[in-house]
Amino acid sequence: MKRNLLCIVALALAAVLCTGCGVKDEDLKSDPLVNADGTAPVGKTLVAPAPPEGFTLLDNKDILAANGLYYASWVNGEPQPYENSEGKTVNLYDAQLTLVVQENKTEEKAASAVSGWQELAQQNYDISDTQTLIAGGQEYTVIQFTYQDESNPYAFGVAAFGQKGTSAIEWELSCQESYTGDALAVLTEFLNGCTY
């Protein structure tokens, strides 16, 4: 069961990030869950801050809520059509920030999920830096990386892995070469603005 849930999470992340995706506009017609102040609750674990200048909430879904899996994403730049590895035309942005929250029954399961995500990152990315960051009172392991898969339209990124009680949390900012912002600063701003 634990392995199956980890596989589901890995497949969800791969579908979102590793295939060079984005999502079609018509797939985003569902009302995203956003508060009046621009903050976005993601599961029961956290409320993501209103996005910094230049970023827009693209999606906020409870993709597998029955399994405690929640997903949100923010984008920067204008959408550009892109044909992904599956032959589907999707929108691609200068940068896309993805948040995945997996709410578990135990802290051990949350720790296992975080560990699994970190292992996947080591397998799929060339990691140039790893550090511990405390933001918004929460400790994260932060990596900076480039993508190993040259067919991925995103060139580099930064990710943060953390655990809050029984919840596993992963933030990942994927950037094209054209992105001129400071990826680590943007991610840190999001992390500092979270409430748990």
Regions found by a protein language model. Name each.
Residues D37, A66-S73, G136-Q144:
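Short, hydrophobic/aromatic-rich segments at coil-to-beta transitions
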Residues S115-A159:
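Signature of long, low-cysteine stretches enriched in small and polar/charged residues
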Residues P51-N104:
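Secretory pathway targeting signatures of secreted, lumenal, and periplasmic proteins
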Residues G22-K24:
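Bacterial signal peptide processing site
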